[in-house]
């Protein structure tokens, strides 16, 4: 028998395929299912979802900021500060409050604290009553509660009401850092100077550890403002706290501020937390002004 090359086209759904003599035929494909072209594998079983697929929101939905995975806490590390053992940089982003932008009503500040990869480490929320916020303005005393990814308060910042005039070297600004809440791990105290913003970082025993020095003029357009963190003898720069330029619109019409903190990777985690507290004190002292004043 001569062999002929016959190219068969896919049958229509519902028809039977003819086989060798004596066979009753093969059932055709079900209606509604396409027959794969020659050379392609047939589809697998239907009805089972594909596992381990990333879930994405619909277009226009707000993106969820990922949290930094919690590392194993080292010995003698206050609970919640183990995140700081693996980083040498923090990014602080203040959230925009619509009510404050529209009518100028001062609300409690909220911040996202992230690492250099954009992963959220902490969430900070101010806890101050309405009367104090709107009567004292940026000079107000406040309690800042810093939460981890489990919603636990791991750091508490306490700023008392102090004098804001540089002409009087008494009752200068100060902030206390507690980790965990109720256990002081350090302080940031203002050092009097007629022209420069200066601060001292202290440990829980109020012993001086580092110094902070800012520029003479706390004003800049389209550029960052750096506060250098130095050794006690002012010879070495070990880090800095930078107020980032957020853009002309935000700078003019809101008091939303973004900061960056850089410190040595091997710095004591307690001092890293104290530098975080210094950042909030600097924000309220120099950049938390109501727009239009």
From Swiss-Prot:
It is a single-pass type II membrane protein. Residues 1-66 are annotated as: Proline-rich domain (PRD). This is Phospholipid scramblase 2. The lineage of its organism: Eukaryota, Metazoa, Chordata, Craniata, Vertebrata. The keyword Transmembrane applies. Its cofactor is Ca(2+). It holds the Pfam family Scramblase. A lipid is attached at residues 166-167, 170-171 (S-palmitoyl cysteine). One of its GO terms (molecular function) is phospholipid scramblase activity. May catalyze calcium-induced ATP-independent rapid bidirectional and non-specific movement of phospholipids (lipid scrambling or lipid flip-flop) between the inner and outer leaflet of the plasma membrane. It catalyses: a 1,2-diacyl-sn-glycero-3-phosphocholine(in) = a 1,2-diacyl-sn-glycero-3-phosphocholine(out). It comes from Bos taurus.
């Amino acid at each position: 028998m001569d062999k002929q090359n016959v190219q068969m086209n896919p049958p229509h759904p519902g028809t039977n395929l003819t086989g060798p003599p004596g066979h009753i035929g093969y059932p055709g494909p079900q209606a509604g299912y396409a027959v794969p072209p020659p050379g392609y594998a047939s589809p697998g079983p239907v009805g089972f979802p594909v596992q381990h697929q990333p879930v994405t929101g619909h277009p226009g939905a707000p993106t969820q900021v990922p949290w930094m995975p919690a590392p194993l806490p080292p010995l003698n590390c206050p609970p919640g500060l183990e995140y700081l053992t693996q980083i040498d940089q923090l990014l602080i982003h203040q959230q925009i409050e619509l009510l404050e932008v529209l009518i100028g009503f001062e609300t409690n500040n909220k911040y996202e604290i992230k690492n250099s990869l954009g992963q959220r480490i902490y969430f900070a929320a101010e806890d101050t009553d309405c009367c104090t916020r709107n009567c004292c303005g940026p000079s107000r005393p406040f309690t800042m509660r810093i939460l981890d990814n489990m919603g636990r308060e791991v750091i508490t910042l306490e700023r008392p009401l102090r004098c804001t005039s540089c002409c009087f070297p008494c009752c200068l600004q100060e902030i206390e850092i507690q980790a965990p809440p109720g256990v002081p791990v350090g302080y940031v105290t203002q050092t009097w100077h007629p022209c420069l913003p200066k601060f001292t970082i202290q440990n829980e025993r109020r012993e001086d550890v580092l110094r902070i020095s800012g520029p003479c003029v706390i004003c800049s357009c389209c550029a960052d403002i750096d506060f250098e963190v130095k050794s006690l003898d002012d010879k070495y720069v070990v880090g800095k706290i930078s107020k980032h330029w957020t853009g002309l619109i935000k700078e003019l019409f809101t008091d939303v501020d973004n900061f960056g903190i850089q410190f040595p990777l091997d710095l004591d985690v307690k001092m890293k937390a104290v530098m975080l507290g210094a950042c909030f004190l600097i924000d309220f002292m120099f950049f938390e002004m109501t727009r239009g004043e």
